[in-house]
């Protein structure tokens, strides 16, 4: 199994810790962030394979985080996954338009997340 470095952006401490543990159990290295601005700084300064980004962040929303990461050019290879409590077709369209590669609804199903990440990281 390949080890990937994953940026995890979630402002809720319990959700962040749960997702961090899940990803680490899968063998990945996880770098946590709790704000959009810190996520952008980390993404631009590092080379992550994947970033899980909560849409509802307290400072800069996840859509803006994705747009800024994508517009930098440096992180074009990073797979971006939106974490959100909304699953309407418009929510998915908005995530894709912002530059996300995938859309995951919270609360996250661990098995479904593991399968989806495996598929994304294989591409």
Set out the residue ranges of the language-model regions.
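Conserved acidic carboxylate
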Residues: 10
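Two-component/phosphorelay signaling modules centered on CheY-like receiver
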Residues: 13-31
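Acidic, metal-coordinating helix/loop segments flanking the phosphotransfer/catalytic sites
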Residues: 32-50, 93
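Acidic catalytic/metal-coordinating carboxylates
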Residues: 35-38, 61-65
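The feature encodes the CheY-like receiver
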Residues: 58, 88
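C-terminal output helix
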Residues: 90, 108-117
């Amino acid at each position: 199994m390949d080890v990937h470095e994953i940026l995890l952006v979630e402002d809720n401490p319990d959700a962040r810790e749960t997702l961090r543990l899940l990803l680490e159990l899968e063998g990945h290295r996880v770098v946590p962030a709790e704000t959009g601005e810190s996520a952008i700084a980390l993404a631009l300064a590092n080379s992550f394979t994947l970033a899980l980004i909560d849409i509802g962040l307290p400072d800069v929303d996840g859509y803006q985080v994705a747009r800024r990461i994508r517009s930098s050019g440096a992180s074009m290879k990073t797979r971006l996954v939106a974490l959100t409590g909304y699953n309407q077709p418009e929510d998915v369209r908005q995530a894709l338009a912002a530059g996300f590669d995938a859309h995951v609804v919270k609360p996250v199903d661990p098995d479904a997340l593991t399968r989806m990440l495996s598929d994304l990281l294989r591409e």
